[in-house]
Amino acid sequence: RDVALKDLACVEFAGFVLMNFERDPVPFDEFIAPVRAFLDDLAIGEMRHYWWKSIPIASNWKVAQEAFFETYHVPATHPQLEKPAAEFIYRASEQKDFQFSHRHVAYDAFPHGHGRFYAGEKTPMAGNVQPQGGDPVEAMAARLQLLVDGMDAQVLQGDIDVLLTLRGKPVPSGSSLGAEYIKALYARAAAEQRPMPKPTPETLGMWGGEIFIFPNVMILPHAGNAMIYRVRPAGSDPDRCTFEIFSTRSYPAAVKPPRATLQRVTDLGDPEQVLLIPRQDLGNIPRMQKGLHSRAMRQTWLASHHEKMILNMHQAMDRYLRA
């Protein structure tokens, strides 16, 4: 009252503090409604700090986050994660029965600019598992280890430790290794009194997917963990932004979560500061920004399926700007 500051619409939700500078903003409950159930069911409000980094990127903030609104970049950007798909892309494999799983990813564009993508049909999460040689537990653990070593977020070492407890155990008739793994994760969490997402098909289907909260927050959930991106302009320079990565997780009842501390990255190319997968992702973005400044770049077309979240974001921004 003494300093006569203007009132600001501010809401605390799911661990976030969200602010709106509009004089007459859309009611928050209406704004968040399209994605609220996903966030609640994934227990995002139970996530706590694991690590947090701020990375300067030489690109516009919208370009930086658009790179994470589709999944088809994965085999080309991260060939170590999907070797058959990378072979198909880089070596022009003509294997006619090749199944490029990312074409089956489902995308949703929601009101107010929000969106999501998730596994969809004919993907491993939906039960379409390609036959592999050797021990399936070891093969699955090796795949997950690439994620742990490459980003230490979303999938954590403790998740692999749980998976490895299934070595030598037969998979019950009518079940699958993935289903048994999920049971083991939830059994461990129950014993530790650790909050977990709802074990429903809809919620489990979001593991490995993404929820976008307009205008600049992306949440990539997994088994009681979530990697969160927040992208912001860097001052008034349209060719620079600040890209933040939050590795979060829920904790057992007996464990006190660590206090959040920010690590400021000074060199994106330094593997001691940034792990392999975000280095690969974020290393692409400055080149994309340069391409947008090319004299030959007059217009771009967005794919109606794979890039619908990008289009939806820009349409929502256009509505705000026109208002």
Where are these regions (language model features)?
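Hydrophobic, small-residue-rich alpha-helical packing segments that form membrane-like cores
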Residues: 1-2, 12
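Flanking scaffold residues of small Cys/His-coordinated metal-binding clusters
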Residues: 5
